[in-house]
Amino acid sequence: MHYFSEKPTTKSDVKIVEDILRGKKLKFKTDSGVFSYGKVDKGTKILVENVVVDKDDDILDLGCGYGVIGIALADEVKSTTMADINRRAIKLAKENIKLNNLDNYDIRVVHSDLYENVKDRKYNKIITNPPIRAGKEVLHRIIEEGKELLKDNGEIWVVIQTKQGAKSLAKYMKDVFGNVETVTIKGGYRVLKSKKL
């Protein structure tokens, strides 16, 4: 049973984790059957610390898990959409918005298989720590279909372990967007960015 399954079958065992992201002390309820259980994932942290957002941005946290990316950025942007196929993750993300006192911000959490249920708007930024184990085809769909949902000059930001195919993903992003930038290389991870021109 993978964290990118719709309904995890593992027994629930909630753990609260605390972390400092972008200078903010945040708390997250995590649970078994959801990605990065019991601690904030290193790749996600590197992505969150390096992504550049603007106060007028509408952002999409794709494959949000229990909500780290969207929650860390929600008070810096205009609107935040968080999407995941995993229903346990969706429930946790909603609870974590409350836990971090973000109820007054424009945040929505959507149960969605990739972009299926979030096509109702366009985004300035799509930010994702993609489910590498779901395979290359899923990764390619994230890039390709993401381009369609970006506003002009919008960007897709992706974190990936160097050893899990970062170079071939960068090449694919360049093929789709005509550009790719390696924003940072740190701790065995790369943060990649492509812009819709």
Curated annotation (Swiss-Prot):
Which residues of the sequence carry a binding annotation for substrate?
129-132
Output one GO BP term. rRNA base methylation
Give, as one word, the top-level EC class.
Answer: transferase
State which Enzyme Commission number(s) the record gives. Answer: 2.1.1.-
Q: Where does S-adenosyl-L-methionine bind?
A: 63-67, 84, 129
Q: According to the lineage, what is the superkingdom?
A: Archaea
Q: MF terms per GO, please? A: rRNA (guanine-N2-)-methyltransferase activity
Q: What is the purpose of this protein?
A: Probable methyltransferase that uses S-adenosylmethionine as the methyl donor. Binds neither NAD nor NADP in vitro.
UniProt cross-references to PANTHER family, sorted A to Z = RIBOSOMAL RNA SMALL SUBUNIT METHYLTRANSFERASE C
Name of the molecule in the record: Probable S-adenosylmethionine-dependent methyltransferase MJ0882
Q: Which organism is it from?
A: Methanocaldococcus jannaschii (strain ATCC 43067 / DSM 2661 / JAL-1 / JCM 10045 / NBRC 100440)
